[in-house]
Design a protein with these regions (language model features):
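C-terminal helix/juxtamembrane-tail motif
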Residues: 2-4, 106, 132-152
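Glycine-rich portal/gate segments that line the openings of hydrophobic small-molecule binding cavities
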Residues: 40-93
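Hydrophobic pocket/interface hotspot
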Residues: 20-24, 31, 56, 73, ...
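Beta-strand/loop substructures that line and gate deep hydrophobic ligand-binding cavities in soluble
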Residues: 84-140
């Protein structure tokens, strides 16, 4: 059984790609007020939510249970509308040595977009399940962000 793996989910949204991506690079702190499964988010290190290497604390609901973790942005590629995040510490570190996710938004010809979330992980041992619950978390969260942006 492999310890490393990759999972991804693609979510079709009605919001234009640039507007959808923009909330993640300029208003990331608002996600806790938009997404039902984000209970809390706050700065741990740094003073800007939207720059690489600033560290945030998050409490999320994944698989029906609250989990705590830290997150930092590793890279932002505005041209390709992608952000690479590293999730670590807290409950993540209990099961995974490595837990990164790539968020990317693709334009669609109808004016909407596709939001893609890809997790790359390494489990601490083979008894740990792949992080399938995060796929549901990202799917639901992406739709909540879309709904919020369509009303804005």
């Amino acid at each position: 059984m492999a310890l490393s793996g990759k999972l991804s989910v693609e979510v079709t949204v009605q919001t234009p790609a640039a507007k959808y991506f923009n909330i993640f690079i300029t208003q990331f702190h608002k996600l806790q007020n938009i997404c039902e499964r984000i209970l809390e988010g706050n700065m741990h290190e740094g003073d800007n939510w939207h720059v690489p290497h600033s560290v945030k604390n998050w409490t999320l609901i994944v698989d029906g249970k609250p989990i705590k973790l830290k997150e930092k942005i590793e890279a932002i590629d505005k041209e390709n509308k992608s952000i690479t995040y590293n999730l670590f510490d807290g409950d993540i570190s209990k099961n995974y040595k490595v837990f990164k996710f790539l968020f990317q938004v693709f334009e669609k010809s109808d004016g909407g977009a596709t939001a893609k979330f890809t997790i790359e992980y390494e489990k601490i041992n083979e008894n740990v399940e792949a992080p399938y619950g995060f796929m549901e978390f990202f799917d639901k969260g992406a739709k909540e962000v879309d709904s919020y942006l369509l009303k804005a």
